[in-house]
Amino acid sequence: MAELLECRNLTKKFGSKYALDNVSLTLGRGRIVGLLGPNGSGKSTLIKTINGLLTPTQGEVLINGELPGVESKRIISYLPERTYLNDWMKVRDIIEFFADFYDDFSTDKAYEMLERLHIDPKDRLKTLSKGTKEKVQLILVMSREADLYILDEPIGGVDPASRDYILETILTNYNENATLLISTHLITDIEKILDDIIFLKDGKVVVSGSAEAIREEQGCSIDAYFREVFRC
């Protein structure tokens, strides 16, 4: 059986600048993986390339052994870094739209998460705070039964008091046979849920492996090791 996700010698250039530089990695099934790096390290470029939103300069991405396309979009549930929803829509209208568009979307799960996060489905997006809009986007992503969930900075715009609740929402609502790839620079908040980590620096993978094994080998937390690797 093919790996769920495989990147082979992936390079992406914008002009003469390397956003990704010969990235090779594989993700199996049933793992929670942290894609970790400072701003500008190439995390979002890698995620967009995996989703087929950017074309690599060299190398390739394989999803279940196939290039990104219509079939890969059926099994990937993607949370982009920026809000993409129309402000004039009501939350319930967006849920109905996703339910019509995705066969694997659970309306019941979406409304359950709205209730737990105290979001009124009758509200229009333009009346919601930035953090609440991001919660709505997260709910939409986690209401699908996907094979691969890709979350780009899911807690970046959420206040610290809500972060644990957001992480609990992620953990209790994703398909446990699926893989969860989470991009973030907020290591302290998220390392407790990670099975594996990938450190991305200047578009290159500089560290990858089991989070537990790396903690044992380095004798410190992932956050402390991250600070050491990326020390200015």
Where are these regions (language model features)?
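Conserved ABC transporter NBD signature motif
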Residues: 59-72
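ABC ATPase "signature
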Residues: 208-209
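Helix-to-loop junction immediately C-terminal to a conserved catalytic motif
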Residues: 51
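Catalytic Walker B motif of ABC-type/P-loop ATPase nucleotide-binding domains
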Residues: 149-153, 158
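ABC-family P-loop ATPase nucleotide-binding domains
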Residues: 81-136
